[in-house]
Amino acid sequence: MEDSDFDDAELDELYEKAINRRVNETLIRRSLPVQRDLQNGVVPGQDTYYEEIRTEVTFGPTHHQLNEELLHSYIYPTNFEVRDYQFDIVRKGLLQNILCAIPTGMGKTFIASTVMLNFFRWTKTAKIIFTAPTRPLVAQQIKACLGITGIPHDQTAILLDKTRKNREEIWANKRVFFTTPQVVENDLKRGVLNPKDIVCLVIDEAHRATGSYAYANLVKFINRFNSSYRLLALTATPATDIEGVQEVVNNLNISKIEIRTEESMDIVKYMKKKIKDRVNIQTTVEIENIVEQLGIAILPVLNQAVELGIYESCPPSAINAFKAMQKSQAIIMNPSIPEGIKWRNYFILQLLNHVGQMLKRIKIYGIRTFFSYFQNKVKEFTTKYDLGKSTNKIAAGFYYHPMIQAITKECEEKIKDPNFLGHGKLEHLRDELTQFFYENPFESRVIIFTELRESALEIVKCIDSMENSEIRPHIFIGQAKGKEGFDEVKFVRKHGPKGRKKSDREKRLEEERRMDEEKKQAALQEKLERTSRRTGSSEEAQLSGMNQKQQKEVIKKFKSGLYNVLVCTSIGEEGLDIGEVDLIICYDTTSSPIKNIQRMGRTGRKRDGRIVLMFSSNEASKFDQSMNDYYNLQKLISQHLVQYRKSDRILPPENQEPECEKKFIEVSEEDQELNNMEDTDDVIRFATQCMLGKIPKTKKGRDKGKAKKGKTFFMPDNVITGIITANNLVRKRKSAQNGSGAALLDSIVNDDIDLEDEDGQVEILDVDQEVNRRLASNAVQKTNDMALQIRNEETPEIGDTRNKAKASSSMKVKKEPTMAVDHSDDEEDLPLSRHVERASRETAKEVPNATNVAEKPFPPLEFGVQRPSKRQRLQPEVQPEVQPEVQPEVQPEVQPEVQPEVTVKPEVKIKTEEGSKLYKNIFFSDEGFLQPHEKELFLSKYNPEDATVTIEPVPRFVRAHGRVKHSKRTEQLITLFEDMNHNRVARTIEMNKLRGIARRLHTVSQSQGQSNSQSQAHSTSQKSQQASQKDRSSQDKDLTNSELEDLLDSDF
């Protein structure tokens, strides 16, 4: 269960504002007769009085907004026949919390729809909720509510999916809801639904509201905040005893129980005729022989249990599995019994429980169902006992008894005959079906109820073996997968001797693989054989269970006539709209009156029906006892032995009794279309589309503009909420007047400075002092600052920024007429552009008091220092080719197809004094890099001793810089740093490989140096030999360098 999102303070606030229920307790003391002595004195130690507490519950005005003009009357739809019991229950259900217990098929959904309709009229904004435990029941109520009462479909919502998508918006905008109790409970605890908004709650299958089921938890949560709401509980049987009825009344705050039976005076005239036939089936000779043999085998164990006082004395054939299980649980829970005695008694009772199950199966269901259970238990115990995994000698005396072996042999011989019927019920079942389909038309339907899946499949096979094409059976069970029997081979392989040698282990593994493959092949072959049989789908369902889709498909085929006999377990007893059924056959019976009544309520709804009850062994007495308990329960309820809870009237007290307004409800075309639907999923799908305004639930139809309503968090006043980025926490500087000039210059170089202030005015950037300081530290001569030629260009799309930046090295840049710096005025208007071009020597003017530069500037496409590559440093004798200076070609005409129209921003101005500029045109060979003395310090202090390949320190590179194109070396460095920042594995592997090669070269170089120094100490006669040896070593080194070239040609 989820925790509630409300804190204690919010809970108290909701409680105080929402609860209009007041409880007044009065303490009354009453005197008791006392014993007196001879002097008429009261004998001490006696209670002279007792205290009686009287509780009076009152309710204040409701907090719901009511439509005052509609409170004087309530509407009762006349679209169907007006029945007295329905009319009476609706009238009482509008003013009290009612538990409506009437037989199945008598219109409980109509009663609920009428109550929901009137509370929809009486209130303005309150919520009406219908809850049911299953989807089919919800679909039935949707049809009844929208297709009968005419409640607007745009005010209704269906909440069945587990997703919480748009749940808050649906609860806020709709008024009538059809859902399951789990959904409502979870949304209440999450704070999505306000419990004060609920004015009417309908609970279907209310007999489930016991213990910790969702119904009980849901009502308990609502009662904490809201007592002014109407609750209507629907069921066919409230409980099996008076204690269960009282628990349901307490959990649901019931004020009145309206119970009807098929014999009630106001309901009997609306009931269709039901003929009940009781058939007592005698056990066969084969069954009696097996029961007698089981009794002989279990008699020693039963006598020992009787002597120990843990089981009652009885004939072996009367052992009851349920009693044995209860006594075994009581022994386990008793801490006073010593452990040895406790477990001995437990295993004895467990064995009696297993024998009781065997006797029940063979007496009620037949030899086939009995033998599947019996064989599984015998195989499980004997396998474990033979391997030493069980030491229960008491159970061994039973399972290794000669009678058990005789039973196994006899049952195997009987089951081999395909025409063998394991019980007399199967023969009588055949006769009933043959006679029924002979006397009735083929449109008739039959349902057969049984508790066990094995029995259901046996019945299907028995009917199919009749080879009557007019009788088409199919199984109908739940979703759970069938229980697999004991796997003897798997258990032996797991717990048997495995061997200690490697050959034994490999042999065992090979055998396991072979056996698994054989098992898969056998399962596949068996599945193929099942599909070829008429009962193949039923056999597959019995093994793997039936999901909701398969269940819906079977019901659809049953209604259409493809199947006319449905063999159901308990899943077909409650809530499902299976259709009109003319014959019900109860293959077995239960001690629960709820199940028996639910079974018999499947027929006789719209036409007469017939019920066949098959009894064997003690089933007849068990059925009579359960029905007697049900009738006695009705008497106890009618005698007011149940303590009810007072409920709020909700309506103002001046409206003593609203008048009934019988009215024919006009149903819209959409609601009429809903009435014609039979499939549950179609009903739910149609109702969901109506809830959304007939808009299909597609991605395009969703409203993405509305922001999702988030949770409310309580925080101090004026606190900053939301996510704050690190960039917003940094105070940005817009001028160099109040801060360091170095930071401002870095911003200029990195092109991340804003030229305009908050008012849109252009700031004058004065960076003379910082530029002079940096230029003075250089070892090279200073140069004149040149004005920049700048063009304005539209900002590209965000998605194309990276692609354009990558292609900047190959783009053709349009040349504009250059502009010289005019020093007659301090300001000059310059056009802006992403692409920056250097001024040529012919068009640039010198800045006064500036020295000329002795070093040529770099070409426009080379932003960086011309240093020898790694290959050149390894081969110093090879001189790199000098690249001629590329002079920009001045285009006399502007090509509009190459470059867009240029616009000039005259408002952008810059201060151009000595040593200051925004974008530089001349770059020095070492500008932005370490100086010689700094490099020497770096190599001596921070460079590894064994490093032969080093990377020069470089400034911060901006890959998306569009004004100056990077050189090839710079592009490689940028790519390297990006790979290192993203921790790319390929780059790390490549760098490690290069590092290993470099270290190898360094080691070879040192060894060669040592050999050369030793050779210099030799005589001069060996100098020629030393020179030749040196040449050979250099050739070897050149060979290694040639191998390294392929690696160095790559991008690091």
UniProtKB/Swiss-Prot annotation:
List the catalytic activities from the record.
ATP + H2O = ADP + phosphate + H(+)
Q: What residue stretches are annotated with the Helicase C-terminal domain?
A: 432-649
Q: Reply yes or no: does the keyword Transport apply.
A: no
Cite the record's Basic and acidic residues compositional bias ranges: 503-532, 1029-1040
Q: Where is the composition biased (Acidic residues)?
A: 1043-1052
List the InterPro entries hit by this protein, alphabetically: FANCM/Mph1-like_ID (IPR039686), FANCM_DEXDc (IPR044749), Helicase/UvrB_N (IPR006935), Helicase_ATP-bd (IPR014001), Helicase_C-like (IPR001650), P-loop_NTPase (IPR027417)
What superkingdom heads the lineage?
A: Eukaryota
Task: Please list the residue ranges that the record marks as compositionally biased, kind Polar residues.
Answer: 534-549
Q: Which ranges belong to the motif DEAH box?
A: 204-207
- Write the Enzyme Commission number(s) for this entry: 3.6.4.12
GO molecular function terms noted in the UniProt entry? 3'-5' DNA helicase activity; ATP binding; ATP hydrolysis activity; DNA/RNA helicase activity; flap-structured DNA binding; four-way junction DNA binding; four-way junction helicase activity
This protein's UniProt keywords: ATP-binding, DNA damage, DNA repair, DNA-binding, Helicase, Hydrolase, Nucleotide-binding, Nucleus
What are its GO biological-process terms? DNA replication, Okazaki fragment processing; donor selection; double-strand break repair via synthesis-dependent strand annealing; interstrand cross-link repair; negative regulation of strand invasion
What are the binding positions for ATP in this chain?
A: 102-109
Q: Where is the Helicase ATP-binding domain?
A: 89-256
In this chain, composition skew of type Low complexity spans 875-898, 1005-1028
Cellular compartments annotated: Nucleus
Similarity field: Belongs to the DEAD box helicase family. DEAH subfamily. FANCM sub-subfamily.
Function of this protein? ATP-dependent DNA helicase involved in DNA damage repair by homologous recombination and in genome maintenance. Capable of unwinding D-loops. Plays a role in limiting crossover recombinants during mitotic DNA double-strand break (DSB) repair. Component of a FANCM-MHF complex which promotes gene conversion at blocked replication forks, probably by reversal of the stalled fork.
Query: How does this polypeptide assemble, per the annotation?
Result: Interacts with the MHF histone-fold complex to form the FANCM-MHF complex.
Protein known as: ATP-dependent DNA helicase MPH1
Q: Could you tell me which species this protein originates from?
A: Candida glabrata (strain ATCC 2001 / BCRC 20586 / JCM 3761 / NBRC 0622 / NRRL Y-65 / CBS 138) (Yeast)
